[in-house]
A protein has these predicted regions:
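Alpha-helical scaffold segments that mediate packing/assembly in large oligomeric complexes
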Residues: 1-62, 181-187
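Long, contiguous amphipathic alpha-helices that act as assembly "spine/axial" helices in icosahedral shell
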Residues: 1-24, 66-79, 116, 148, ...
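Generic, low-specificity signal for short hydrophobic/alpha-helical stretches with a mild N-terminal bias
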Residues: 41, 57, 64-67, 98, ...
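Sequence/fold signature of self-assembling virion shell proteins
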Residues: 44-47, 88-187
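Hydrophobic, aromatic-enriched interface-forming segments
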Residues: 49-88
Length: 187
């Protein structure tokens, strides 16, 4: 799972016309910072900023302007960004969201109709900064020829079991403008 996440996130670097596998100034050069969703991230002298309500709305607007469908959008973020969101009243308090589930359960659920997913597999573009993505399901694709296959075998010489898992898969970018990468500080 970590390897698949890493491959998909590496493609996220290329969203909005970015360079996949760039270094220095070319690393994540089309990513935006989390605070406003429009200022370009600079990897050389990091300007990453905490995710905000305005930043999320601006990234959604970027997808809207590219005629990306409203359904099947996902916000994928590192745990530090999820922690920042839980500190924003608009996303947690009952008067804003109705049920107040985010306070009770710690689960964010949806923001502006976008499903929120938290992963510790988010890459680090520079220093401790962490990357995330707001994207539509058509932005990136994962194709599996063979799903995860697990096997176990008893190894007498080690008096234990050998457990292996493998998969055959590939990833690709389908729609360049159907996603936006963003960067937040790692701490």
């Amino acid at each position: 799972a970590t390897q698949v996440d890493t491959k998909l996130f590496s493609l996220g670097e290329g969203l909005q016309g970015g360079t996949v596998g760039g270094s220095g100034a070319a690393a994540w050069e089309t990513a935006v910072i989390g605070s406003d969703g429009s200022t370009a991230y600079t990897g050389n002298s990091t300007n990453a900023a905490d995710i905000t309500d305005a930043g999320i709305r601006r990234m959604i607007l970027t997808l809207d302007n590219a005629d990306v469908p409203m359904d099947n959008r996902s916000l994928i973020m590192p745990p530090i960004a999820a922690n920042d969101l839980l500190g924003i009243n608009r996303f947690t308090e009952q008067q804003f969201i109705g049920s107040g589930d985010a306070i009770r359960t710690g689960k964010i659920g949806q923001i502006y109709g976008v499903d929120v997913f938290v992963t510790s597999n988010a890459p680090t573009p520079a220093g401790t900064d962490r990357a995330g993505m707001l994207l539509h399901k058509d932005a990136l694709v994962l194709a599996e020829q063979v799903g995860v296959r697990s096997q176990t075998q008893y190894k007498q010489e080690y008096l234990g079991d050998l457990f292996t898992s493998d998969s055959i898969y590939g990833v690709a970018e389908l729609r360049n403008d159907a996603g936006v990468a963003f960067v937040v500080p790692g701490s």
